[in-house]
Amino acid sequence: MAKMATSRFKLLLCLTAAILESATMCTSDVENQQPRILLQPFEVMQSFHSHFMNSLAVFLSSYYEVSVISEENHRFTTRHISDNKDLNFIKYQTLRKTNQPVMMDIKDDGQLPMKVIQDIKSKGEEIMRMRYSDAGLLKTVREGNYSLLIYNSMDYGTAAVCQFLDIPCIQVITSGMGSVHNPYSLELVNSVPYMLSEYTDLNSLSKRIVNTLFYLSDHYMRTLYFYPGVVSVARDIGLFDHNTADSIDYLTMAAETPVSSLIYTNNAADCHATLPSSYVRIGGALLSNTTLERQFQTIMDRSIDGVIVVAFGRGAGTFNQHTLRLMIKAFGKLNHTVLWSIGSQMEVFKDTYTIPPNVYLFDSIPQNALLAHPNTQLLVTHSGQGSTTEAIYHGVPILATPLRMDQKTNAKKLTKLLGMGLTLDIRALTAQELYKKIQHILSTNEYKTNAIMASHTFRQCDRYPERNILNTIKDAINSPVNINSDRKPKHWVQLISVDVLIIFSSLPVVVFLCLVKCCTIRQKKV
């Protein structure tokens, strides 16, 4: 009897030990489980915005398990990151009759800004509808146990997705400070330069008036133009309840949803702008990797007379043959090596033009790594957000050839404000003018000195951007959902500075007095 009791006791001990060991293993597995991040790239246009989101996905895959939402036939996403084995891809099927991806095509033929805005709205709504009408994608995302969703701020509908999935979200603002929309405070508007505001002093009254006008325009464009369409799509695809969708204040939801905002800016001049704690500057992020492939490294190392990098982004394929011949002629007269990114025109170039021996053509180039090389002396650029940031970061003078949209603002910022180059009107180009401006920049030390100073200021301002990204993500993962839900946006009249408000308030009075004066003069004449 005692032996039987002893056997039972031993069996009980064994079972208890097994249960404890199993519990310990499960606890260990939970503790060691890597947080899962869902990244929604910006697929509306092939641009710096989409490129940065893809680069961010690759960077984060070294620290987290990252899944990327992507359209099945999206060439841009597929080309750049689909072969990365550290990333998981959640594909959704296109609803279009063709296999062409939904993508904006911004032309250089005088396309009006309103047409661009209309395209962003329509394409954004179309992609949102396609993504989350796919029941398989929505099921995969909901069951994926994701700790965080990261999205681009121009994906206006993602706030609805975050609320539906009930997970923390971070928005990435890749258009610089000018795209910061903070409905809780106008502090940003009072000190941060917006689009076109390089024409005024940084902290002057005129600057604040311009910035406030842009803020109000952006505010009402979102409220009256973008957000109603987003709410309609969200209701149609089941993210919002049909009965309550019309009563949703999407402006408030869009403001409350992001736990944090990562701001990628290329402007060292706004370094001291006051930012709320949830806004984190990451200018210069992901630019520290400057490793070159052997092909490029060999060319750069042997070019002791210096290298000129030429890249026009998406504008590379928009120049006519006359303009291209003028460029080739000017580049061929230089003693420097020219590395030219020409996009998909490689075969056309070789068959159509005689390429000088000092000019090397590539369909794409590792621009950031090339600018970091000590032999690089100049960047000829369209002045996009990515190119100008890389030029500032590495202290390389520029010859700016702005083509569209914010590129003219970027060009003025670098040439007028920072003094690190010159601007050239590519539409009135002559080979002699191009050659002379390149030679002038290369022979004037002031441009290089100013570029180095801008680089120093920029790096001191946005220190440790990669660390800032990781810390922000860590905090967001550990934060409760709807952390900002107790805050309500105030009306802009409550936030606007007193002097600007006085000026705005006096305008109707001034107009009224002018009308009275005009009527009085007319009556006297009668």
PLM features: residue spans?
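Conserved beta-strand positions in the Rossmann-like core of class I SAM-dependent methyltransferases
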Residues: 67, 339, 399
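Cleavable N-terminal signal peptides of Sec/SRP-targeted secreted and luminal proteins
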Residues: 7-25
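Nucleotide-sugar-dependent glycosyltransferase catalytic domains
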Residues: 2, 6, 29-36, 42-45, ...
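Short beta->alpha connector loops at strand-helix junctions that form conserved
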Residues: 90-95, 173-174, 382-383, 400-404, ...
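A donor-sugar binding/catalytic signature common to diverse glycosyltransferases
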Residues: 73, 149-151, 363-411
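Nucleotide-sugar donor-binding patch of glycosyltransferase catalytic domains
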Residues: 188-189, 281, 351-363, 389-431, ...
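Donor nucleotide-activated moiety binding/catalytic core segment of transferases
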Residues: 305-306, 314, 339, 343-345, ...
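Conserved donor-nucleotide binding/catalytic region of nucleotide-linked donor-dependent transferases
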Residues: 417, 421-422, 427, 435-454, ...
